[in-house]
C-alpha cells in the first residue's frame, strides 16, 4: 500500500515538472511537507505552482513571525571616534602682549660746581741748603715732545766753576746757593743726590725749539767775584719732532744775557743727536755756555709739565738775585724770541 502511494506521488511530480517545462509558465513549488515521511526533498527546488506559492507564502509568513519573535537584536554599533580636523578648529590667537612701558629716565643730577680754588697768593720761598735738594727722577717719555726732548738731550762739559745741581724739589723747596768765596768750584763739585737738567719746548715760527736749563749754586770766576746762583741754557732747534729722523737746524747756547748761534751746528759739536756744550769762565768775566767738541755729562731730564705743582710755583715765584729762571712762564717765550737764529 505504501509503495504504491509513493509511486503514484512520484509520477504526479514528474508529470508536473514536464508540464512546467513545456509551457514555460510561472515556476511552481511542490509542497513536500506530506511526503517528508516517505522521501527527502530534492536537491534542486522545482519552480513553485500557484498553490504552493500561496502555501509557502503562508508558511513563510508564519516563519517570519516566529523569527521576529526569536530574532536576536543586532548589536548597537559603536560609532568610531571622530578624528578632529585641525583645520576645522583653530587655536585662538593670543592677544599681543603690549611692550612694557619703560620707566621715565630721571634727568641726571648735575654735578655740583666745585668751589673756585682760592688764590694761593704769592709764593713764599722755602730755602734749603744747595746740597740737600733732591732731583726729580727722569720719567719715561710718553708724548711726542717728551720723546724728542730725551732724544736730543745735550751733554755739558764743565771747564771751570760749579757743577750743575738741582734747583727745586717736589715740595717746592729751593736751593739756597753759595757765597762767592773760595775757588770757583769750592763747595759745588757735584751733588750727592744727583744732578738735573730742566726742559721745555714749543713751536716758534714753524720750528720746534727745545730749551735745556742748568742751575749752578754760584757764578764766581774767583773768590769774591760773581754772584750767588746761576742759570744757563741752550736751545736746540729742530725741524719737526713728529717725524722719524728730525734734523737739528741750529743751536743757541746762552752767554751773558745773550746767545751764541750756530746755524747749523758744527759736526764735531754734535754726538749723534746730542749737542755738546761747555760751561766756562774767562777771568774776570762770569761763566757762560758755548758749543764744544769735548764730550760732557748727562743729567736726569725733567720737563716743565712733569714738575710738581709746587715746583712750578717755586720756579715762577722765587727770585734768584742776578740770575733768572729761563724756562718759567715769564721768561720762556721772550728768551726763545731773543735766541731766534734764522
Curated annotation (Swiss-Prot):
Family: Belongs to the Necrosis inducing protein (NPP1) family.
Low complexity biased stretches: 55-75
Coiled-coil ranges (or none): none
Domain of life: Eukaryota
Broad class of where this protein is predominantly found: secreted
Pfam families: NPP1
Glycosylation sites: 24
Ranges where the record places region Disordered: 41-125
Name used for this protein in its record: NLP effector protein Pc107869
Alphabetical UniProt keywords: Glycoprotein, Secreted, Signal, Virulence
Upregulation: Differentially expressed during the developmental and plant infection phases.
Motif (Hepta-peptide GHRHDWE motif): 226-232
Ranges of Pro residues composition bias in the record: 93-121
